[in-house]
Amino acid sequence: MLIEDDTGFVLHARAYRETSLLVEVLSAQHGRIGVLARGVSTAKGQVLRAALQPLQWIRFSALQRGELAQLRGAEALDAAPRLVGQAMLAGFYLSELTLRLAPRQDPLPELYLAYGEARARLGVGAGLAWTLRRFERELLTSLGLGFELDSASDGQPIDPAARYELDPQEGAQRLLSERAGERRAAATGSALLALAADEEPDAADLASLRLPMRRVLAHHLGPRGLKSWEMLEQLAPKR
């Protein structure tokens, strides 16, 4: 299959043999695809190699043969955001999460748009925690793994004053326990309603979403977690 003038975001690139790269791209028309880019480590291939760096937005053509596509050409469509510190780790997280959960060769236009928006927010210094929670929500929804955020699994409306656990399959379940530890690990109703309405909540409510959303994602990821989680964990109090 010939892929012509598709656009995509580079999720990951690693060296292959002496002069090539294996690149994972989230494309607009074909979803996540693996691409073999030959000759990029030669003197003539430096411009192409620069276009295949993580977070870069590209236009590309390739010939799909089996699991890997053979890259025919690529060009950068903008300057990739120059991220440092926490923002750089957040960018790594977006890409790693997409790489792990998005199936290959399955068009996911909503995920493509969500990734592009999150990337743009990181580039302008928008709040990291809210950017990540919004992306997690959109990723789950685009993969058919999302659930209602404004109503509980029993059909009752979310109570802003209550706390909720997030079941990966059933959705929000009201927490009845009064134990402080369990309540701290549950999302506030206000936070869930804000996430449903795409309106950033206050800092305390926003912080309450991190662990419940992580549990949902961990369920779908399986026993192997994310490398970026290990790094972001050290920065959690600052986010």
From Swiss-Prot:
Might you report a single GO cellular component term? bacterial nucleoid
Q: Does the keyword DNA damage apply?
A: yes
Q: What highest taxon heads this organism's lineage?
A: Bacteria
Q: Which UniProt keywords apply?
A: DNA damage, DNA recombination, DNA repair
Protein's GO biological process = DNA recombination; double-strand break repair
- Family statement: Belongs to the RecO family.
Q: What does this protein do?
A: Involved in DNA repair and RecF pathway recombination.
Descriptive protein name = DNA repair protein RecO
